[in-house]
Amino acid sequence: MEAWLYNLLQWLALPEHGLSTVFVIAFISATLLPMGSEPAVFGLVKLNPELFWPAILVATAGNTLGGMVSWWMGWGTHHAVNKWRDSSTHIRALAWLEKLGPKACLLSWLPGVGDPLCAVAGWLKLPFWPCTLYMAIGKFGRYLVMTASLLWIFPGQI
């Protein structure tokens, strides 16, 4: 599996793949695989400044679709995690998520907790489309702020 993923990433690193690479990397990084898509977005925009908005939108779409997959995975595992049901941490986290509802998916942009949050939202069977909307808003904001900040910190052409 590791060799396959490495070969895929090497192929996607080819410059002629541009926006499709950003989409695939953003999609994969929204699952529970440890991967960041921000460097791919920044690299593409740094090399092609005219692709700023297309890259942000494509990354948002890929990352949101990946979050939707995580939601469905969480929904499908609803019956598989009964053994953690009684822990106090689990009960507090579930109460917090149920209180916030789909709006909790605004936090899907957070590193480390955002992707599992999408899965837990599915596990809780929070409404799919509102969760998707809030995921998209959070992820769009992350890509916009992160890419604009990096371009501001590292100005000029390569």
What are these regions (language model features)?
Residues 34, 39-42, 117, 133:
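A broad, structure-centric signal for solvent-exposed, well-ordered loop/edge residues
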